[in-house]
Amino acid sequence: MVADSQGNVSIADPSLNIIRKMTPGAVVTSPAGNCLISGFADGSGNNAHFDAPRDIAIDTSDNLYIIDSNNYAMRKMSPLGVVSTIVHGSYGFADGTGSAVKFGGNASGIAVDSAGNIYVADTGNNRIRKVTPAGEVTTLAGNGTAGSVNGTGAGAQFNSPMRLAVDGSGNVYVTELLKRRIRKITPAGVVTTFVP
């Protein structure tokens, strides 16, 4: 759930494959997605299709960033409701660009920093991924092994990372479902346990 500069609240609805928005006056709309279609398509309104949009983030320009989980994609929705694709990969694990990118099942957390970089909790791969505005995907931290080891980059381990937040200095905070911890990742990829 995110709030924009006008006080509107948006959520991703994975069961209906839509994005919902509620105004400060409690008017609820569905600005993108089609509850009758589970699929993949860019566009506006119900011409845009999602397959289990799982989490949502917002930038300072009120653009929404969406994990389109079953499409292994990161999508962007403008304030006017136009949906575009930043990266569309497939199942597995691979960094890179375009269709070469792979995400694990149930990628579940997303956050965006002030430079427009997206951070994804790749839950199935126990990694935190970074997606640049140009769509280049790299692994910020984690090596795929489930654990709670602090370290740098691939020297760190996560156990089912779920939700993310980014502070003004570019540090990423990660919640772990199974260990019930909050981890901190610096922009250089140094992982520490923030809340044990």
Where are these regions (language model features)?
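Conserved beta-propeller blade signature
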Residues: 8-10, 63-66, 117-120, 171-173
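Gly/Pro-rich loop segments of beta-rich domains
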Residues: 25-54, 82-108, 136-162, 190-196
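Short intrinsically disordered, low-complexity coil segments enriched in acidic
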Residues: 1-7, 11, 17
